[in-house]
From Swiss-Prot:
The chain crosses the membrane at residues 37-57, 63-83, 101-117, 124-146, 155-175, 185-205, 225-245, 263-283, 292-312, 317-337, 405-425, 435-455, 470-490, 508-528, 593-613, 615-635. Its main location: membrane. Gene3D superfamilies: Cation efflux protein transmembrane domain. It holds the Pfam family Cation_efflux. NCBIfam families: CDF (TIGR01297). Belongs to the cation diffusion facilitator (CDF) transporter (TC 2.A.4) family. SLC30A subfamily. It is found in: Membrane. Residues 532-566, 751-770 are annotated as: Disordered. Residues 1-36, 84-100, 147-154, 206-224, 284-291, 338-404, 456-469, 529-592, 636-770 are cytoplasmic. It comes from Dictyostelium discoideum. May be involved in zinc transport from the cytoplasm to either intracellular organelles or extracellular spaces. This is Probable zinc transporter protein DDB_G0291141. InterPro entries: Cation_efflux, Cation_efflux_TMD_sf, Msc2-like. One of its GO terms (cellular component) is recycling endosome.
Length: 770
């Protein structure tokens, strides 16, 4: 297993000195110690592989995943409590320590459940190959994916081989006995792949988080970990009781009846998988390089698995594709960690033992190895990208709108995972399908969240107007997404109207009610922003105020001036909308309508047996979704196509008349009005000056520019104005030449900050061209 459930239970074999760890007698030389450690590692990993094979038969025949996880967590907690005696810490627990205990319990709970799920749906040998040492290989794969340049360096080629080896295991290395459990091959693949990836990510996450804690001595950390195991056991016991009630009501509770002999075997398996395995790892990591350690461990697992398959049968747990995956993984590790690539081993401290044990990862010193990945100073590409991720999370939390999107995204994903897990548990296709539908909603929320974060970035040379238009693009994409959903539901409804299918309403009503509640929370969360976008409410905390602060560097204190401007233009409130939030709101509204339709149709079917209620409700919902999303697509498309905003379009005549009435203006050659995003309207004008203004260009153009800018900002909500002045020229015969050969081509670029008075226009930029 790629990470221990409770690292505290195997530290009793170490000394408490500064060097710590298991020590051999001085009578052994270094080569002798290495050989003995390799033999000890080889046989211990083989015994672990056999233990996982026995665990597979328990999971497939007599014990569920929840029950097996409970018993294993119980025995692990007992071993830990006996060794660490954590009750001495209970009387002096601090809030920070309680928080760490909760973290330990959650990690332990999820890691052991996903591990047992991987054993059941992928098989023991495949799970070992695809999970061992991934806390070291996953960051390397992640770094290679971010760098690109596939197959260009040894590091990228090795990463590709690792990904192929890992992916082949859940794709082809499934157990053939799973067909008797009522799962299809696609279900086995998805469940196995999901469990394996989540398990490996949790192990990596646990090591990263716990390693960053500074809680004093390793003994204190071990006691906290022991208490975390006890909390995990209690939570799993509650899950087991709930599972027992559910299976008892359905008459299938015999699967979780465990005998004393089976409990004894599970206790031995737990000791081997967690205590003995980690103790051997701790000893081996101090004397062996990562290259040798990983090769010996994985080779032992495959060889002992083959030996067991010779007596038990290959079809039960050992697919031939595992050998190919093993070859890919071993060769990739050799490429990535060999001396030829200048990869120097470094230590990755164990997450529970205060840094006494270490796992050797990688530190490429450059050259053809693809650059530094991780080094002792915390630099390198992988750490760099993790720092970027932390900064993005900080940006999300800082802004109220993005914080609400992120919060609801997490709630949506949690409900999706619970629904998926319960659907797999009960083998309910309806629950699994609804969970997949919620995944599309989560995708829409993720798109909106990304757009909300990017839109706050400052303008630069490449994006001179900033990143605000990403919100418009997000709204347009989500609108197209909703059109696709509406058309799909419409086609399915018509098909069901023509050929009504048999409908199983089991658990459908419960799931629909829960989904309705979740979506209702989201609707109320985003309704304020959505109402604001249509003119409801005068607050600016989630709309233009944040963008103005980001793009122009002004505080919210300037809103008072802005509020003096908005009443003059009655149509401005209509334009103050966040199409990004509109897209999220419409997604939630569509999902809520879907839940309402399912609730209504389920009640009609259960009460009156009228099965056509389901396609009729779906048909009505698809039409409502289609009609509600059309305004969003129309508005975002007009913005992306740079159409003249509707309030300005209806006032073009007044704008032209005002500009022509200014002293010094001879003609308007061309004008363009467009919206960059929700709160930024832009005007570009080419104005021809008369003879008087042309002869005194600097003073007159400044006066004309101020008049036009003030008028457009105050009366028409135009925030940026770019004006090009063309003089009216005369030739030697005193005939007007228009703007054929201008002597002065004077561009005036004026940024109008709408939370300031019109006097700020004096900060405009002047460019002269001959």
């Amino acid at each position: 297993m790629a990470g221990s459930l409770d690292d505290s239970i195997y530290n009793n074999g170490r000394s408490g000195g500064g060097g710590g760890g298991f020590k051999f007698s001085k009578g052994f030389n270094k080569d002798s110690i290495s050989k003995r450690i390799i033999m000890m590692l080889f046989f211990s990993k083989g015994i672990r592989a056999w233990s996982c094979i026995i665990l597979l038969y328990f999971l497939q025949s007599s014990i569920s995943i929840i029950s097996a996880s409970f018993y294993m967590c119980l025995f692990s907690a007992i071993f830990s409590v006996v060794v660490e005696k954590p009750w001495n810490l209970l009387s002096s627990l601090r809030p920070s320590q309680i928080k760490k205990i909760i973290y330990h319990s959650i990690f332990n709970l999820l890691i052991i459940i996903t591990w047992n799920s991987s054993i059941k749906f992928i098989g023991p040998i495949g799970s070992i190959l695809a999970s061992d040492y991934t806390f070291s290989t996953y960051p390397l794969i992640f770094n290679s994916l971010l760098q690109g340049n596939f197959l260009a360096t040894d590091m990228s080629r090795g990463s590709i081989m690792l990904m192929i080896g890992y992916f082949l295991i859940p794709l082809f290395g499934i157990s053939n006995r799973l067909d008797i459990l009522g799962y299809t091959s696609s279900q086995v693949f998805m469940i196995g792949l999901f469990s394996l990836i989540v398990h490996n990510v949790l192990v990596l996450w646990k090591k990263t988080i716990v390693r960053s804690w500074n809680s004093g001595s390793s003994g204190g950390k071990n006691k906290l970990s022991s208490l975390g195991s006890c909390v995990s056991t209690i939570i799993l016991f509650v899950f087991k009781l709930f599972e027992g009630f559910s299976s008892g009501s359905s008459g299938s509770d015999s699967i979780n009846q465990v005998s004393y002999s089976q409990l004894f075997v599970i206790a031995i398996i737990t000791f081997i998988l967690y205590s003995l395995n980690q103790f051997i790892d701790d000893v081996s990591e101090k004397e062996l390089t990562f290259n040798v350690l990983s090769k010996v461990s994985l080779t032992s697992s495959v060889i002992f698995g083959l030996l067991a398959a010779l007596f038990i049968g290959f079809k039960d747990f050992f697919h031939p594709i595992l050998i190919l995956s093993f070859i890919f993984i071993i060769n990739a590790i050799h490429i990535l960690y060999s001396k030829s690539n200048d990869i120097q081993p470094m230590t990755f401290s164990n997450n529970m033992d205060g840094g006494n044990s270490s796992i050797k990862t990688y530190n490429s010193s450059g050259g053809g190895g693809g650059g530094s990945i991780i080094n002792g100073n915390g630099s390198g590409n992988a750490i760099y990208y993790f720092e970027i991720l932390k900064d993005v999370l900080r940006q999300i939390v800082d802004k109220p709108t993005s914080r609400r999107i992120f919060t609801f995204l997490v709630i949506n994903l949690m409900f999706m995972f619970v629904e998926m897990a319960y659907g797999i548990w009960t083998n309910s296709l309806g629950l699994i399908t609804d969970a997949c539908h919620m995944f599309f909603d989560a995708t829409a929320l993720f798109i909106a969240l990304v757009a909300e974060v990017i839109s706050q970035w400052k303008q630069n040379d490449k994006y001179s107007y900033g990143y605000g238009r990403f919100q418009v693009l997000s709204g347009f994409v989500n609108g197209i997404f909703l059109i696709f959903i509406a058309v799909t539901i419409l086609m399915e409804s018509v098909e069901r109207l023509l050929e009504p299918p048999e409908i199983n309403t089991d658990k459908l009503l419960l799931v629909s009610v829960l989904g309705f509640i979740i979506n209702l929370i989201g609707i109320f969360s985003f309704h304020g922003d959505h109402g604001h976008s249509h003119g409801g409410g005068g607050g600016h905390s989630h709309g233009g105020g944040e963008k103005k602060e980001k793009h122009h560097g002004h505080s919210h204190g300037g809103h008072g001036d802005h509020q003096q401007v908005t009443p003059i233009l009655g149509e401005e409130k209509k334009k103050k909308r966040s199409v990004n939030i509109d897209g999220v709101f419409l997604h939630l509204l569509a999902d809520t309508l879907g839940s309402v339709g399912v609730i209504v149709s389920s009640l009609i079917i259960q009460i009156w047996g009228y099965t056509l209620a389901d396609p009729i409700c779906s048909l009505l919902i698809s039409i409502l979704i289609f009609l509600s999303v059309l305004p969003l697509i129309a508005n975002t498309a007009k913005t992306l196509l740079q159409c003249t905003p509707e309030p300005i379009q209806s006032s073009l005549y007044q704008i032209n008349q005002f500009i022509l009435s200014i002293d010094g203006v001879h003609n308007i050659i061309s004008y363009h009005f467009w919206s960059h995003y929700d709160d930024m309207n832009i005007a570009t004008l080419k104005i021809q000056l008369n003879e008087t203004a042309s002869s005194n260009s600097t003073l007159d153009t400044e006066r004309i520019k101020k008049s036009i800018s003030k008028y457009l900002n105050k009366d028409h909500n135009i925030h940026k104005c770019i004006i090009e002045f063309i003089p009216l020229l005369y030739n030697n015969n005193n005939q007007q030449q228009g703007n054929d050969v201008p002597l002065i081509n004077h561009h005036i670029h004026n940024d109008i900050h709408h939370n300031h008075s019109s006097s700020s226009s004096s900060s405009s930029h002047h460019h002269r061209h001959n």
